[in-house]
C-alpha cells in the first residue's frame, strides 16, 4: 500500500539521539539499525579511505534484500542476521581471507587494507609466492653440499647416488662400495670413485660385467694398423712390410716409405759390363767360328776391388781344351789344359785396386803372352796350338765371369768363380766388340756403375746367407759372437745382421732405425721381438763410415765401441740372453742385409738394409762371394760413391 511504501523513507530518532551526535558513530546503530548515508558512514569510520571502501559495498548489501522484508526486520535486533552479517563483514579486510591459505600465518585488518603475515618459506603481499631457498644467493644451494630440492614453503637437501646424508641433513658422504662388497669386481680391481666405483683392468683388457673378469681387447679387429696388426694379451703391435720399402711411422700405427738419407751415385753405362750380375753362372756367353789360322786373343780394360774370381773362360767345341783367365790374390792367374799340356801360372802386379787396368792375353806360336798396361807380366810356353782347328775352322766358346758347371771339377786349382768387377773396351779374337755392346745395352742389370768405392753394397732388396759355427769348445761360455761392423747406410732403417733359427724365429738381430731426432739414426740390438740395447741418435748417414763392435755370450752383451746406450734391466737382459742361449744350442743361419721369409712380428725391424757394410764375425772378414746364397743385386766388393751435388743439380 502507499502507506507501507512510504515507510522506507521514514527515520525515527531514538531516545537521547542528541547525545549520540557527539560520539563516534557506531556501525550497528548508524547503518544497520538505521539507514545511513555516506556522511553518516564517515562518522563511523572517521576517515575517507575506509568510508570510500565501505559505502559502495553497503549499498550492495541493502539492495540484496527486498524492501518489505527490511521494514519488518528492523523491529528486532535478532531479526536481521543476513543484513547484519553482510554489513558487519564489509569493514573487515581479512574477510573473506585475502591471504594464500598455504602461505599465511595471520591476517591483520587495516584501514581499507590488510596485512598478511607469511609463514617461513613464503613471500608476497598475500603470501602467495614460495621462496626458493635453493637459489638464495646469500645461502648458496640452500647450504646443501649436493642436491637442493625446493618444496612449497620449504626445501630439503638430498644426495646423489653413491652418497649418504650426514646427520646435519646438509652434507653428503661418499659410499665406499669396494669396502662394502670386496668381491663385486671379481678378478678385476675395484676402485672407489666419488659416488660410484669402477672395476679396473690392466691396459689392453676390458671388464666383462657378466663374467666379472678382465678380457683381452682385440685391437686388431678395430683396424688400428695401416698394414699388419698382431694382437697379444694386453696389447697389440703394428708392423709394416719392410721388404716392400715401408717402415712404421712415429704414431706406431701408420706406415711410411723408408726414405733415403744419403743419396748414392747409381749411374751406369752400357759400355761397362758388370761381371757379378749372376751369383751363380756366367754373365755372357759368346761363340766364335774363325779360320783355322786364327789364334786365341783377348784384350780388355778391367776394374775391381775383388781379390779372386773368374774373368773369362774359353774352351773348344768338344771341351777337350780350355783356358781360364782369373784373379787370385789380386793377381792375374792363367790355367790351361789341352792335349799337349796342363799348366797354371799366377803373376804380375796386384790389380784389384779399383783402377782401370788394360789386360791382354794373346796366343803366340809357342807361348801365351799376358800383358798389363801393355807390359808383359807372364809368358807361358805351350808345345802346340791352344785349340785345335777342325774342318778348316777354329770354333771357340767364351764365357765371361764364370764357367760351365761341369768344368769346376776339371780345374787344376779350384777357384771361386764369382768376381765383382767391370770390363770395358773388350776385343775378343781380334773381332772387336763383335756386337756385344748391343747385347748389353738391352739389359740394364748387365751395366756397371760408373764410379765405385771399396766395400760391400746392399741395395735394400735382398740378403746374403752364411752358415757360421759360433761354438767354441775351448771357451767356457760355449758359444760367442764377436761382431765388427763398418757401415755407411743410404737409408735410415734396415736389418744389418740377423741370426735365424730353424723354426723361423730371430734370436739375435742388429738393425738400423730412424731416430726421433732429426737426421740421426739409432742402432738396436734385439732378441726376437725385444730390444735389449739401443744406441741413440747417431749421424750415420754421412760420407764417413761408422764403426760398431760388440761381443755376446750366454751371460752378457758388451759394446766395445764407446757410444751412449739405452738398455733394459739386468734381470730382463738375462731373460733375453737365456732365449738366445737356447737358440744358439741349435742350428742358426746368419743373414746380412735383411731377413728371410719370417713373420713380420719376428723382429722390431724387417726392412732390408741399404748401403755399404763390411762385416767381421769372430775374427773372420765375411766375403760375400763365399755366401751360401746372395741376392744378385748385392755387390760383394764394390760400393756406389756418394752422390755429389753439382751447381746444376
UniProtKB/Swiss-Prot annotation:
Protein's organism: Macaca mulatta (Rhesus macaque)
Annotated InterPro entries: Coagulation_fac-like_Gla_dom, ConA-like_dom_sf, EGF-like_Ca-bd_dom, EGF-like_CS, EGF-like_dom, EGF-type_Asp/Asn_hydroxyl_site, EGF_Ca-bd_CS, GAS-SHBG-PROS
PANTHER family reported in the protein's UniProt record: LAMININ G-LIKE DOMAIN-CONTAINING PROTEIN, VITAMIN K-DEPENDENT PROTEIN S
Role summary: Anticoagulant plasma protein; it is a cofactor to activated protein C in the degradation of coagulation factors Va and VIIIa. It helps to prevent coagulation and stimulating fibrinolysis.
Region (Thrombin-sensitive) residue spans: 61-89
Gla domain boundaries: 15-60
Lineage: Eukaryota, Metazoa, Chordata, Craniata, Vertebrata
Residues where (3R)-3-hydroxyaspartate is found: 109
Protein name: Vitamin K-dependent protein S
Start and end residues of each Laminin G-like domain: 272-448, 457-639
